[in-house]
């Protein structure tokens, strides 16, 4: 290790260092900005290794807990959730090197003890961690927290997407160069006792990779530990690192490269080095020497045996999951293996596979046996960029795994070009006025005058907002538009050039997309007179994470645009003629309705009813009565989980939560999600799955070459796993993988939230999304996936797709096969091997 006062000689980065930087960055999961916040697997960067190995790695590198406290499992055993047979099965499946007892009784004794002897695995410490552990008073701890605050403050200014009134001058530079430029004038570090901070940064190389190489060399980090060291450094600013990883993801999806995360890593590493050079005392230097010796020890990534406590908790987690799957398979086994009747249904309703839809679908089916519901990804197979009026670009209404293939512009129905221009000009004018007014309210001087002179005028608005009578802010989707115009808004699917870009769909594209969507939904006949294509969204106020309650398959947007596009294309007579040539005959009296399911209030909105033929008015009346009853049943079921059941006004209270700006739990989102079932609805119809199952319609008998099976396993199944693991991470360790206390959130740059007024950007879900204040509402379980298809077909998809194989081989989810008779017959065991399931077990 070079002494701290040696000149900062720039070192040439080696291929090994480049690989270590890339590897550390790949371990970080992306964080989408608030405007299209979607669920992300927080362990995405570790999908190449097993779930068990990842738990060991994260504990070794950063001492992060990835399992529940042992008391949680003890309570599950005490309550009977985990039975002795579940514990025995978990023990039998555990690897020998976990060094666990063979008897359940011995395991129960270990489970009762929170303080077994723990042999700590090697931990790769950063400078900040060593300073914190020494904790010679609060001064050095304060410096490490100060480092995080300063980096976070700088990131909020640099990445700001329009929240701040004053923009950072250096935003035109790349991150590392912009940070060096801003540091030149920043005296905060010196004020905190970090001497010569600006000089130290200036002495280090201007190239960010060379700066990392120099610092790593000067700190004496062992070669084998460099990637772990850099990973740990990123975890200490994990929120902003995750956002930078999102920028990398977005560029890579477009075929580009982005080095923002690597440059942010350089900033963090240089900050750590600045803290390092402040401590020249023997105590710190000795602690650092020991830390680097420990970092040089052989890693234990793939062995839990080095940590007995972790092994015990892991086998208890396995037993907990075995118990859930046992109950799920038993419930599915009790249902008669029904077959679709083949008769024409009165109504068909396609919903998103979202677990919240399961409750509404079950309610509809319980009211009428003539109703057929279908599950499909909520973007309905139309990967579009939807551009609202007055915008140059739009948002991607498709899963984040995909890029939009089509651009669809919003338009006002029945307008001339002059009226279109007038509406556009008026919306832009109103937005400029509001922006100017906002600038006046927030500027350094006028903000004080504004509050003193106009504050009292807002008393009525504050009161009506508090009573949930009015919205606290304008709906951004309709902001600046008149009510008469809002009622005529809709997607325009006709092809035309807008701003030099092709928008809409030509005839060949419409027919091809329509066929692909119908076959992917296993929906080739018979067709009802009314077919609902139901996207979903949510309603809440004062909720930065509102997009997280909208449709993940639509990229964190509501799904009505996709549903209306799909319905319009499927109602096109020329499209239907083309479909008949391809073997799909839609009757002339079938009409597709674009709809939106509000998952907070459970209301269903029907769109474009002016296009409904007069012959279908009675069908519409019957449908509305059905939906009203289904909405009421669904609200009453959700009221129990929301804690308002049993009240005379339970339904109204469910609705009121959507307008209450003090409500931290407007709805439970996807809490409780635990299974994914791809099979005909006949297999699960009549079974109460408790709003915990993703239900995807799939009939392998209609799947030519199993192309739809591949689509399901590579897209919806993967996205469902992301959602499941985000909820898992936010439950087992909300401090590391979640967003903390929603009550304390402050929005930073419109990108994410801080917990309080400082600290790192928060990732994952707020505590209130998984816990009701008394107990966990979400159960931390890896996803149980059940697919009805031949074993050979499922195995072929696994073998041909490395990402899917990593998920199933590394136990990030549990895969089961359903036989042609509708019974769960086999469990996937890794290595393309299946284990038959005893139907009597």
From Swiss-Prot:
Keyword terms: Cell inner membrane, Cell membrane, Membrane, Metal-binding, Transport, Zinc
Subcellular localization: Cell inner membrane
One Pfam short name: DabA
Membrane topology per record: Peripheral membrane protein
Keyword Magnesium found: no
Chain positions recorded as Zn(2+) binding sites: 352, 354, 536, 551
GO cellular-component term (any): plasma membrane
Keyword Ribosomal protein found: no
Alphabetized InterPro entries for the sequence: DabA (IPR018752)
Needed co-factor(s): Zn(2+)
Subcellular location, principal: membrane
Molecular function per GO: zinc ion binding
Family named by the database record: Belongs to the inorganic carbon transporter (TC 9.A.2) DabA family.
HAMAP family referenced in this protein's UniProt entry, alphabetically: DabA
PANTHER family: INORGANIC CARBON TRANSPORTER SUBUNIT DABA-RELATED, UPF0753 PROTEIN AQ_863
Quaternary structure and interacting proteins, as annotated: Forms a complex with DabB.
Protein's job: Part of an energy-coupled inorganic carbon pump.
UniProt-recorded name of the protein: Probable inorganic carbon transporter subunit DabA 1
Taxonomic classification: Bacteria, Pseudomonadati, Pseudomonadota, Alphaproteobacteria, Hyphomicrobiales
Gene: dabA1
């Amino acid at each position: 290790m070079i002494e701290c006062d040696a000149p900062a000689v720039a070192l040439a980065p080696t291929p090994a260092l480049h690989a270590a930087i890339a590897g550390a960055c790949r371990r970080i999961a992306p964080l989408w900005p608030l405007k299209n916040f979607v669920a992300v697997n927080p362990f995405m960067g570790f999908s190449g290794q097993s779930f068990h190995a990842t738990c060991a790695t994260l504990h070794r590198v950063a001492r992060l807990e990835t399992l529940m406290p042992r008391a949680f499992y003890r309570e599950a055993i005490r309550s009977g959730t985990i039975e002795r047979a579940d514990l025995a099965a978990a023990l039998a499946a555990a690897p020998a090197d976990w060094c666990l007892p063979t008897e359940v009784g011995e395991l129960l004794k270990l489970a009762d003890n929170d303080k077994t002897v723990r042999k700590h695995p090697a931990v790769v410490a950063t400078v900040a961690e060593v300073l914190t552990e020494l904790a010679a008073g609060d001064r050095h701890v304060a410096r490490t927290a100060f480092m995080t605050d300063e980096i976070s403050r700088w990131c909020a200014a640099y990445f700001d997407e329009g929240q701040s009134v004053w923009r950072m001058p250096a935003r035109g530079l790349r991150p590392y160069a912009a940070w060096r430029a801003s540091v030149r004038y920043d005296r905060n570090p010196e004020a905190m006792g970090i001497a010569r901070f600006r000089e130290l940064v200036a002495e280090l190389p201007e190239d960010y990779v060379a700066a990392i190489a120099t610092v790593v060399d000067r700190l004496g980090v062992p070669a084998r530990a460099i990637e772990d060291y850099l990973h740990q450094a990123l975890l200490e600013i994990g929120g902003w690192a995750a956002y930078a990883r999102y920028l990398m993801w977005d560029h890579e999806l477009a075929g580009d490269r982005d080095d923002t995360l690597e440059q942010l890593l350089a900033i963090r590493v240089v900050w750590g080095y600045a803290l390092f050079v402040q401590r020249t005392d023997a105590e710190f230097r000795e602690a650092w020497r020991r830390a680097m010796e420990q970092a040089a020890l052989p890693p234990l990534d793939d062995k839990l045996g080095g940590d007995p406590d972790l092994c015990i908790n892991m086998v208890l987690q396995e037993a907990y999951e075995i118990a859930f799957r046992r109950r799920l398979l038993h419930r599915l086994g009790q249902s008669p293996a029904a077959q679709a009747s083949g008769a024409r249904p009165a109504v068909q309703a396609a919903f998103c596979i979202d677990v919240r839809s399961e409750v509404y679908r079950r309610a509809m089916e319980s009211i009428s046996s003539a109703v057929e519901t279908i599950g499909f990804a909520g973007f309905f197979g139309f990967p579009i960029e939807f551009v609202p009026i007055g915008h140059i670009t739009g948002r991607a209404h498709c899963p984040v795994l995909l890029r939009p293939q089509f651009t669809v512009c919003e338009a006002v129905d029945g307008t001339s070009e002059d009226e279109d221009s007038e509406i556009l000009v008026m919306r832009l004018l109103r937005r400029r006025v509001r922006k100017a007014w906002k600038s006046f309210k927030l500027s350094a001087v006028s903000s004080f005058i504004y509050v003193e002179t106009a504050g009292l005028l807002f008393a009525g608005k504050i009161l009506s907002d508090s009573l949930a009578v009015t919205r606290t802010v304008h709906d951004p989707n309709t902001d600046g538009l008149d009510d008469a115009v809002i009622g005529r808004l809709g997607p325009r699917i006709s092809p035309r050039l807008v701003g030099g870009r092709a928008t809409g769909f030509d005839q060949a594209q419409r027919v091809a997309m329509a066929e692909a969507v119908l076959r992917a939904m296993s929906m080739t006949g018979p067709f009802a007179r009314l077919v609902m294509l139901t996207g979903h969204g949510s309603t809440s106020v004062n909720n930065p994470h509102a997009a997280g309650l909208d449709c993940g398959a639509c990229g964190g947007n509501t799904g009505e645009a996709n549903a209306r596009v799909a319905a319009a294309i499927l109602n096109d007579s020329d499209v239907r003629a083309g479909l008949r040539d391809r073997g799909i005959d839609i009757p002339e009296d079938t009409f597709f309705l674009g709809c939106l399911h509000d998952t907070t209030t459970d209301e269903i909105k029907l769109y474009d009813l002016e296009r409904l033929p007069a012959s279908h008015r009675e069908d519409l009346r019957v449908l509305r009565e059905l939906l009203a009853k289904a909405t009421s049943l669904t609200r009453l079921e959700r009221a129990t989980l929301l804690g308002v059941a049993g009240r005379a006004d339970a339904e109204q209270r469910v609705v009121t939560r959507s307008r209450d700006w003090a409500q931290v739990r407007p709805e439970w989102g996807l809490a409780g999600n635990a299974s994914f079932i791809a099979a005909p609805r006949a297999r699960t119809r009549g079974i109460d799955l408790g709003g915990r199952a993703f239900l995807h319609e799939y009939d392998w008998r209609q799947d030519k070459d199993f192309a739809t099976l591949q689509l399901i396993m590579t897209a919806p199944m993967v996205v469902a796993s992301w959602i499941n693991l985000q909820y898992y991470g936010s439950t087992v360790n909300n401090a590391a993988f979640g967003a903390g206390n929603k009550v304390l959130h402050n929005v930073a740059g419109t990108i994410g939230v801080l917990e309080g007024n400082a600290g790192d950007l928060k990732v994952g879900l707020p505590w209130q999304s998984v816990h009701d204040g008394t107990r966990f509402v979400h159960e931390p379980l890896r996803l149980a996936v059940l697919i009805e298809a031949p074993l050979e077909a499922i195995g072929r998809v696994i073998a041909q797709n490395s990402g899917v194989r990593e998920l199933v081989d590394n136990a990030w989810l549990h895969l089961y096969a359903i036989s042609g008779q509708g019974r769960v017959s086999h469990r996937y065991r890794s290595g393309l091997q299946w284990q038959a399931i005893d139907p009597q077990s």
